[in-house]
């Protein structure tokens, strides 16, 4: 067999078989010495040991056993023979290897080539690429490369040149990088240059990806190997032809030391954009893209300054945000000019700000009366409002408009949103909103799985912003309760001393618990767990008593939400579910909102809109799926019952009224009889 093309002593190749020397010891590829990685194979330091001269010990080397552990030579006869992995018959070939991009390598070599190594792995530039000729066209070859230490010195870059700084650090076992196309025929290898551009260098000694592990500030030499074999498993027993190109040696660094090397890589590597002054980096792209959008933004603000009757929404950054530009003044807010100057000076600081500015610019060309849906997260808008001191100087009109913006965000899925918003501005009952900006009170619950869709459908609190217990609603955050934390039943609140609140609350005097009480009677015990996390309430500013009850005395605005949950109308899933996309799932939702909406709502709107009308309407019994769910335009008064003008018949209306009276009486009487019962368990009536 042909000797390797690089037979120097530095190669440290040692034979297994005495008559025929091979290139690598078996222990380099076995897990007993070091775990082998494919396509990267390990060469442990044991490869530099003394060659095995006795042919009978070759099997012991394969098994990864230490030679001295074998007391007698006859034990090696029991090990598996190597005959099954003998190489193929020799084929006459004379490989020739030339380095691609030799001129570029020479330029780097004159300055002292540096290769950056990182924890995550970094590719080489210039890439190691060779062209092979002289192979047998039919025989299969495996092409691979490795990187070995060029000397035993550690270097440092001092006075614009590399100099020896001391003795080299211990080297990690070197890994062989097998070309991904291996094995392939000689004809395939000779058809095009062989590139090892996917080889990655790392300084992570615990690397699990098969990258080549190098030490920083050490000099290394890449080596190229050709092995004639048709299977990777035959590599340990095959002859390696090794080729070394001295101009490819380099010093591994974690950051470039020589500025000339840095410039040379920038000039030749199309992917080296990190060092360019006028490159296509992310910050440069943002600055270039921000210039036209800033000009359009300034032109729009100038147009707003000229037109005194421009609407606040035409240049509004986001619908949910309080108006930065007062509709009654002709001068823009100082905040707007300040932000414009800041963006001109620094450009966009992040991709998110760039996207937000583009969206704002696109929205500025929308019609005056159009209000687009919100494009930024609610918490982000609220955080910007808290940091805006100029917001306090707004007129009551703009503050009221901001309240409407918050209100429109909570009902953004409704079709008649803009028309209801204009009507609500002229509603005399919304005058109280001009004093303080109320955040919407929203409680969304999902019913437990044992409830059908007809038990919990919709719930409305109408006109409750004028109630006494809704005064603490000037908090900056709406109340959100996770569905799994808030499931309620009618008896849970009456047992907590809240029955009289139901009887006296405006807009909630019409109660219907027919289906709820029937469910309780059927199951024999209350199946409505009442659970609300203490930390959830505390984070929203709701007081929580120490003994574990839900509401302290006096009642807060949560009491009204919880009390009205007992007044849920029982509806039929057959009449409401198909036309309501929001309630198309089998888990009904509840939503509380203190704001009032006019009654003129088309029948096609969803249940949330219908439930938020001027009064709380009672649903029919679950046995009457055809009864109407439309609300009455006549507001409730505490002493009088409202008339059901849109029921199916007077008999159904009278029956509903009787049921309502019975339910109110049952809830009030439950105050005394169920005071000892815990909120989670209630005896059925």
UniProtKB/Swiss-Prot annotation:
The keyword Transcription regulation applies. Gene3D superfamilies: Transcription factor, T-box. Residues 104-277 bind DNA. Residues 296-308, 340-361, 378-403, 410-428 have a biased composition (Basic and acidic residues). PROSITE patterns: TBOX_1 (PS01283), TBOX_2 (PS01264), TBOX_3 (PS50252). Residues 652-676 form a coiled coil. Its main location: nucleus. GO terms for molecular function: DNA-binding transcription factor activity; RNA polymerase II cis-regulatory region sequence-specific DNA binding. Residues 618-633 have a biased composition (Low complexity). Keywords: Coiled coil, DNA-binding, Nucleus, Transcription, Transcription regulation. Transcription factor which acts as a transcriptional repressor. May also function as a transcriptional activator. Binds to the palindromic T site 5'-TTCACACCTAGGTGTGAA-3' DNA sequence, or a half-site, which are present in the regulatory region of several genes. PANTHER family: T-BOX PROTEIN-RELATED, T-BOX TRANSCRIPTION FACTOR TBX2. This is T-box transcription factor TBX2. It comes from Xenopus tropicalis (Western clawed frog). The gene is tbx2.
């Amino acid at each position: 067999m042909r000797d390797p093309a690089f037979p120097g002593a530095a190669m440290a190749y040692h034979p297994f078989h005495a008559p025929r020397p091979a290139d690598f010891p078996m222990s380099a590829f076995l897990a007993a010495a070091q775990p082998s990685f494919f396509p990267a194979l390990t060469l442990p330091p044991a490869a530099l040991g003394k060659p095995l001269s006795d042919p009978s010990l070759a099997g012991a080397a394969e098994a990864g056993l230490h030679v001295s552990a074998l007391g007698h030579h006859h034990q090696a006869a029991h090990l598996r023979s190597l005959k099954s992995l003998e190489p193929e018959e020799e084929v006459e070939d004379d490989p020739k290897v030339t380095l691609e991009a030799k001129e570029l390598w020479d330029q780097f070599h004159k300055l002292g080539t540096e290769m950056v190594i990182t924890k995550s792995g970094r590719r080489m530039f210039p890439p190691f690429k060779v062209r092979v000729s002289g192979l047998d066209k039919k025989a299969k070859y495996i092409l691979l490369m490795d990187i070995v230490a060029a000397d035993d010195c550690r270097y440092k870059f001092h006075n614009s040149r590399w100099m020896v700084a001391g003795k080299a650090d211990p080297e990690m076992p070197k890994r062989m990088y097998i070309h991904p196309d291996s094995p392939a025929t000689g004809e395939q290898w000779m058809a095009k240059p062989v590139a090892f551009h996917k080889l990655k260098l790392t300084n992570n000694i615990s690397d699990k990806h098969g990258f080549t592990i190098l030490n920083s500030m050490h000099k290394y030499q890449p080596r190229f190997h050709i092995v004639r074999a048709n299977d990777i498993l035959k590599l340990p027993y095959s002859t390696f032809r090794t080729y070394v190109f001295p101009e490819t040696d380099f010093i591994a660094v974690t950051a470039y030391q020589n500025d000339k090397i840095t410039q040379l890589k920038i000039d030749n590597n199309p992917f080296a954009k990190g060092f360019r002054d006028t490159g296509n980096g992310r910050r440069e792209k943002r600055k270039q893209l921000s210039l036209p959008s800033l000009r359009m933004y300034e032109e729009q603000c100038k147009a707003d300054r000229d037109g005194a009757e421009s609407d606040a929404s035409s240049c509004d950054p986001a619908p949910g945000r309080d108006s930065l530009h007062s509709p009654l003044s002709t001068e823009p807010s100082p905040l707007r000019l300040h932000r414009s100057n800041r963006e001109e000076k620094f450009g966009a600081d992040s991709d998110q700000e760039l996207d937000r500015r583009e969206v704002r610019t696109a929205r500025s060309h929308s019609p005056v009366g159009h209000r687009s849906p919100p494009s930024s997260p609610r918490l982000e808008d609220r955080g910007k409002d808290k940091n805006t001191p100029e917001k306090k100087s707004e007129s009551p009109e703009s503050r009221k408009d901001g309240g409407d913006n918050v209100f429109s965000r909570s009902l953004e899925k409704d079709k008649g949103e803009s028309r209801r918003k204009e009507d609500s501005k002229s509603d005399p009952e919304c005058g109280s909103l001009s004093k303080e900006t109320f955040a919407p009170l929203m409680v969304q619950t999902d019913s437990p799985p044992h409830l059908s869709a007809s038990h919990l459908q919709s719930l409305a609190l109408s006109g409750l912003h004028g109630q006494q217990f809704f005064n603490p609603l000037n908090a900056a955050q709406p109340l959100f309760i996770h569905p799994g934390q808030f499931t309620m039943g009618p008896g849970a609140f009456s047992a907590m001393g809240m029955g009289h609140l139901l009887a006296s609350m405006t807009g909630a005097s019409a109660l219907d618990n027919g289906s709820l009480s029937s469910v309780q009677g059927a199951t024999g015990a209350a199946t409505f767990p009442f659970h609300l996390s203490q930390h959830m309430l505390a984070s929203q500013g709701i007081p929580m008593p120490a003994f574990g009850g839900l509401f302290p005395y006096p009642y807060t605005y949560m009491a009204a939400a919880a009390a009205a949950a007992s007044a849920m109308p029982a509806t039929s899933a057959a009449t409401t579910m198909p036309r309501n996309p929001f309630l198309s799932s089998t888990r009904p939702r509840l939503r509380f909102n203190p704001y009032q909406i006019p009654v003129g709502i088309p029948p096609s709107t969803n249940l949330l809109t219908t439930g938020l009308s001027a009064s709380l309407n009672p649903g029919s019994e679950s046995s009457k799926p055809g009864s109407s769910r439309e609300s009455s335009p006549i507001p409730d008064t505490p002493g009088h019952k409202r008339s059901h003008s849109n029921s199916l018949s007077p008999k159904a209306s009278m029956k509903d009224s009787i049921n309502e009276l019975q339910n109110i009486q049952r809830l009030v009487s439950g105050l005394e009889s169920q005071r000892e019962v815990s909120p989670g368990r209630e005896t059925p009536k």
